[in-house]
Amino acid sequence: MATSAATLEPQPRALQISRAIRIDSRSVCVAVIAALAILAVAIEGYHPFAEDGGLYAAGVERLLDPTLFPQWTGFVLAPMRISAFAPAIASLVRITHLTVPAVLLLVHIASIFATLLTAYCIAAQCWLSIRARLGAVALLACWMGLPVAGTSLQLIDPYVTARSFSTPCVLLALLAVLRFTSDVPEPKRRRWLFLCAASLTVASAMHPLMAGYGIAATCLSACLRSRRRAVQFAGTISCCAAALVLAGALQHVAPPESHAYVAAALTRTYWFLQEWRWYELVGLAAPLGILAACSGTWFTRLLEPCDRTRGHLSASAALATMATVLGVTAILVALLYARPEASTHLVARLQPLRAFQTVYMMMILMFGALLGEYLLQRHAGRWIAAMLILGAPVFVADRATFPSSRHIQISDTGESNPWIQSFDWARTHTPKDALFALDPDYIHAPGEDGHCFRAIAQRSVLPDYSKDGGEASIAPQLAEPWLAGLRAQRNLIPASLLLRNSPHASALRALGVSWVILRRASPTDLSCPYSNFAAKVCRIS
């Protein structure tokens, strides 16, 4: 009896050591992922008020100060119609008493960390090898700025948008599906099911469109992970058929579209596969081919899966198959219903090819796992060299996209971009109720780098061709005002003459415009209290 007691006595101590090792390994894992999140920001850059980031930021500023943007307000409110993003960020600003740029930066880093951490947890469900798991997440960190074929999306934007929340939430839902369909006790299964539903609910509140494609991905994954072959095949086919039928039904019941809306919709060439360039089409086909290959048995021989149950697809095979089926279905929907010549563009507006964000995520995880397991292995020098080499194209692409701006724009203080300087001057030297007009395509002016006037200057402005055109293409009620705004600014294009008493200046004043921003070379007799080598701010009334 004494011997038996002596034998049993060390077990609690061994259990404590085992738990301590697990906790320590988790701490190291979190630290590594935090370092990768910082690396991802350093590679991709950070531009909080550029492109879509400026659209969302303007909505946050409006909630914090309702006196901002008193004119043409619809273009400020449009991103907030069906998203809780702006109220959430505004609440964080109020709670933390930090500035909007500071909160946006913290949210950006946190969202990247959450994305990488969830991706690592997915990799941990797929492969036993630590090298494979770290390789998957390291490659994702290096390639976060990768463009998703011709969809006009990046895998992760270099600014904060509603996708900053929906992306990690969709990955968390996929993780929950993998755990729910594995061999876990019933109480834990219910917890994972609840986590899946909660993640998709948060994603839906932030970005309903991306959440919809996330729901499709989770449904496909659940079917493919079933132990019953009938569910695997019939469930997958049913999901694809349901998507095609739903798209056809939406196209059939869509209301007639105005001329202004059709004009706005046709400016979004990335909606239509027929408008894509050949290399963008390669960006659709190549990931599907890679993922189809990764769903085969050879892949499980190269990378040992965590689960080897007869009749049960491994997690990696299920995810690869899911992404392949999801991508093929999205292409079919786009080819059948998202066409420029279609009578309505409702399905095109839903942008089915955005589902390829998930496809690209899965492709990168699979490729990164192979890279870590067979090429990088345990050699620290190889890991460092690989991340430098693989991250370099994304870094160079960001510098090419934002050549006149800092790589990481934490604040506008000391900003060398001349357009941002002119927008800053407008914010500090004009009244809040001022209405501005610019070249409708100013966002593509040399050196402008895609920065949003509205978010930086915090002043009302007539709609532009690019970003406000995107809002008009999604919200049909904005199409007529958008077209009217473009017509009013048609003579503000580069090198156009703008005289104080000209009919065009009178037409702008009739709309309430009090200031214009022109390129430095544009001839005018207006008073321009601010100018630099790229732009000038002129009073028109």
Describe these PLM feature segments.
Residues 443, 460-514:
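Luminal/periplasmic acceptor-recognition loop/helix of membrane-associated glycosyltransferases
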Residues 1-39:
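Start-transfer (signal-anchor) and selected internal transmembrane alpha helices
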Residues 26, 36-143, 147-169, 205-209:
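Active-site lumenal/periplasmic loops and adjacent helix-entry segments of GT-C-fold
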Residues 174-176, 191-208, 217-221, 238-244:
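Membrane-interface alpha helices of multi-pass inner-membrane proteins
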Residues 387-464:
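Extracytoplasmic
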Residues 160-183, 192-194, 198-199:
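Specific aromatic-rich, kink-prone transmembrane helix
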Residues 40-53, 64-70, 76-82, 208-214, ...:
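Transmembrane catalytic cores of multi-pass membrane glycosyltransferases
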Residues 500-541:
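Aromatic/acidic, Gly/Pro-rich catalytic loop(s) in extracytoplasmic/lumenal soluble domains
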